[in-house]
Amino acid sequence: KKHFLNVEEILSSSGYVDYIMPQLYFGFKNQVKPFKETLDTWNSLIKANNIKLIPALAFYKIGREDVYAKSGSNEWIEDDNIISRQIEYSRTKSKYDGFSLFRYDYIFNTSENEKINNEVKSLRKLLNLDTK
């Protein structure tokens, strides 16, 4: 037995959900699902005034190849501050109400990966946290 829900209906009516947290684990250069366009789509699907958009972002991809991104597969290796730029862009959306990061251990474990360390510094600055 399969169950489906009508996302457009749920996001158009009050009483179903308070927020939606789509897993936007895509970079800006992802050939299949570019981050900006995908976030814009989710934001535009929300018609009810009380429903908030909280994008889930892929911290774990920093410094790694994304084979599913096709021509954008090396973005997470070559580009800097992707997560910080995604948060900045997300903040421009009318339904934005925060973000989540996946995975905890990639953020808070001491890392030898310079890209991860640079992203953490960028995030701390963006979020006005102590920049030790």
Annotate each PLM feature.
Residues 2-5, 35-39, 82:
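Charged helix-capping and loop-helix junction motifs
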Residues 8-31, 48-132:
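Substrate-binding cleft of secreted/luminal carbohydrate-active enzymes
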Residues 40-49:
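Surface-exposed amphipathic alpha-helices with a cationic face
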